[in-house]
Structures are given as structure tokens and as C-alpha cells.
């Protein structure tokens, strides 16, 4: 999937050019990578770019969000389990480490791992082997691990909630992703990219943004980063009836300068109101 490589990272700002160079430099190695950045900056896109630019590109890319599952389920999800190892384990199941064999395992929100799972992950990083839950057979895997977090892990290390040895095992190569407000010159390119994507996905004619609207989008703080920008562009494409999206068409929270101080938590993915959409189209 060449479109998941470096060329799929949109932007020509100095920060993005540096990021792309970093990815090209490390793609050929097997070193563990720690990707850091605020929520919505595109950490999985960067992990995919690393994988699909590497010699492992024809092998699996497997993604796990460490925060999305409770610790008991996550352990079985990562390491797999043997038949009968717990209630409901009616068959042997291979975990994500085995599924990613030969390829890349992406561990998102790695700062959320429990101390017990941190120990198990450390062992895999050191020895490239593990046992399934309820099993005794050692399984060896050849995988590259790319981890990501939107937290600063060092304070967690100092507080004793994140293992120092695991931190250094993960942080062999560190790739920080800049927030959108630090690469504003990329915003017009991203708007065009997301507008084209949303038009194709929704089966509607392409639309453009007026210069005034683009200038306003480029000046906004984007606390939710690229994810928030993509939501706003899609909302405008679906709701605005004309061919050109103007400043007045932008959502109120984007037009309102005070909205720049809203927390990213408040800016949830857009929920389209079908009745409102039809009313505006008519």
C-alpha cells in the first residue's frame, strides 16, 4: 500500500519536511520507535508511513490501542491465549504480536499500560519472545514495534507509574509530531486534501474554500489538530449547498475567536443532523 508511505503525509512546511526525512532515515532499520504528539496529530499515519517505507512493507501492519481495552482483555489481545485458559476461551487464539510477525506492531497510547503489561512488553522488546495467556510454549516473533503516546512519559517514569527500563527500550528512535498550529502553512494543502477525500467518500461534487475562509482556518489554533480540521472540512462539504465555502459557512465555534481556547475534549467528531442537512440543501 504505497499510499500509506511518506507520500501520504500531507505538508511542505519545514516541520513536515523534517518529519518525512526522519521517517526515510529510520525506515530501513528494525529499531523500536516512539512517536509522540498531541491528540489528533496523526501518530498512526506516521507509524504506517514508517512501515510502508520499510523492507517490511509487504508484511502485516497491526495496530492496537492500549487505552481502548481493559487490562485483562488487552493481555489476551496482545499475547493471544490457549484453549481453556479462561472462561470463554473455547479455542486457541493468536494475539497481535503473532499476527504482526514479520511486520510492524503499532502500540498506541502506550502510556496507559498497567505495570504488569509493562513487564511483559519489556520482555518482548528484550528477547522477542513470549507465552500466550495460559500457555507455557515460548513463541518467538520477528517484529518491529512502533509505540505512540500523547503524554510526556518522563514524568510518569519519575512518578513510578511507567517503568524506566521500558521507557528507554521504547525510546530508541524518537519522532515528535508537531501540532497543527506549528505548521500553519500546511493548512491550505490539508484543506484541499480533506475536501477532495470527503467529496469522493460522500459522492458529492468537489467544493473549494474562499481565500477569506482559508485565511481564517490557517489562523485558528486547532486544539484537536488534524482530526479536528478534517471534521470541519467534511462538515462544510456536506452542509454547504454552494460550490464555494465562505467564512460565513464555517462552524460557529471556528469563526468565534474565543473558541480557540476550548479544550480538545470539547471538540468531538462532528455529528451530522440529517434534517438540518436536507433543509439547507433545499
Regions found by a protein language model. Give the residues of each.
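Intrinsically disordered or compositionally simple regulatory linkers and C-terminal tails
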Residues: 259-268
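Conserved post-Walker A coupling segment in P-loop NTPases
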Residues: 8, 21-87, 98-114, 142, ...
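Bacterial C-terminal helix-turn-helix
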Residues: 231, 267-282
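Short gly/ser/thr-rich secondary-structure transition/capping motifs
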Residues: 67, 84-91, 127-132, 155, ...
Amino acid at each position: 500500500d504505497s499510499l500509506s508511505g511518506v507520500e501520504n503525509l500531507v505538508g511542505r512546511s519545514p516541520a513536515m519536511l523534517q518529519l518525512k526525512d526522519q521517517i526515510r532515515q529510520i525506515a530501513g532499520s528494525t529499531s523500536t520507535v516512539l512517536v509522540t504528539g498531541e491528540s489528533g496529530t496523526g501518530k498512526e499515519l506516521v507509524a504506517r508511513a514508517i512501515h510502508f517505507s520499510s523492507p517490511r512493507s509487504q508484511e502485516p501492519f497491526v495496530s492496537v490501542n492500549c487505552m481502548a481495552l481493559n487490562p485483562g482483555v488487552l493481555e489476551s489481545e496482545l499475547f493471544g491465549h490457549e484453549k481453556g485458559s479462561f472462561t470463554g476461551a473455547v479455542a486457541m487464539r493468536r494475539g497481535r504480536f503473532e499476527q504482526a510477525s514479520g511486520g510492524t506492531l503499532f502500540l498506541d497510547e502506550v502510556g496507559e499500560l498497567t505495570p504488569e503489561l509493562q513487564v511483559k512488553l519489556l520482555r518482548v522488546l528484550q528477547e522477542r519472545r513470549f507465552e500466550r495467556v495460559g500457555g507455557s510454549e515460548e513463541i518467538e516473533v520477528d517484529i518491529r514495534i512502533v509505540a505512540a503516546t500523547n503524554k510526556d512519559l518522563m514524568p510518569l517514569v519519575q512518578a513510578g507509574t511507567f517503568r524506566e527500563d521500558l521507557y528507554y527500550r521504547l525510546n530508541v528512535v524518537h519522532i515528535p509530531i508537531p501540532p497543527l498550529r506549528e505548521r500553519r502553512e500546511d493548512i491550505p494543502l490539508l484543506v484541499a486534501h480533506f475536501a477532495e477525500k470527503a467529496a469522493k467518500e460522500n459522492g458529492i461534487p468537489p467544493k473549494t474554500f474562499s481565500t477569506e475562509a482559508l485565511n481564517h482556518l490557517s489562523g485558528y489554533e486547532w486544539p484537536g489538530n488534524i482530526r479536528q480540521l478534517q471534521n470541519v472540512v467534511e462538515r462544510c462539504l456536506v452542509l454547504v449547498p454552494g460550490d464555494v465555502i465562505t467564512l460565513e459557512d464555517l462552524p460557529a465555534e471556528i469563526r468565534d475567536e474565543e473558541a480557540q481556547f476550548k479544550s480538545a475534549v470539547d471538540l468531538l467528531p462532528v455529528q451530522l443532523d440529517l434534517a438540518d442537512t436536507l433543509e439547507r440543501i433545499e
